[in-house]
Every structure is written in C-alpha cells, then in structure tokens.
Amino acid sequence: VCGNVKEDEGTIDAPIGRHPVDRKKMAINEKNGKPAVTHYKVLKRFGKYTYMQFKLETGRTHQIRVHMASIGHPLLGDELYSKNCPFKHLQGQTLHARTIGFIHPHTKEYMEFSAPLPKYFDDLLQKL
C-alpha cells in the first residue's frame, strides 16, 4: 500500500456501498452500506510503501481497496481509488489472494486453494 502504515496490525470495520457520484466505485457508506470488516497486518515496511496481509470477514466489492483508501493508504498503483500514489508500469494490481477458502455450495465441504505471488508482484517487492 502507499505510505508507511504505523500500526503493525488492526481492523477496519466500516460499511461499504455504492459511491454516491461515481457508479464504478464503492465507498464507505454509513447510511446505506453493508457491513464490511477487514483485518490487516504489516509484513514489511519500505519507507514510502508497506507490504501487508489482509483477512476478510466479509467479501464486499473492492473491500480491501476501499478500506485502505479510507485510512489514507490506498493500494499501490490503484488508479480507481488512488490519484496521489501513482506507480507506472505495473502488469497487474498489487493485490493477490494467496489463500482463499469457502464451503462448497453442494457438498458443504470446506475447500481451500493457495497460489504463489505472480512474478511481476515478486519482482516489484524485490525492487522496493
């Protein structure tokens, strides 16, 4: 994310709903938003940037992007939610689901899948 996140870990509990003006965006919306909870942990600090891990209690559209932008730390290179932290030449978002798990809708079995960081993301971390 952009900036040096001061707390080593924390929780953002803020409802998310449609942005009142820009329909492509979501926003913190106390009145009409749905509950959204994001837990975060700092993995490494790089001065102007912070590498973080997130765990979601809810799965709202753009949840991590909205929550982090709301506390002044948008995702690096996020053109929709961050105008003040540009980062050129990224091949993808600086957001990666390392592990995702869910209960299968038919078998009711818990399933979990993991994936390594994409090369472009790992290369970026090496450059920071």
Region annotations inferred by a language model:
Residues 1-128:
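RNA pseudouridine synthases
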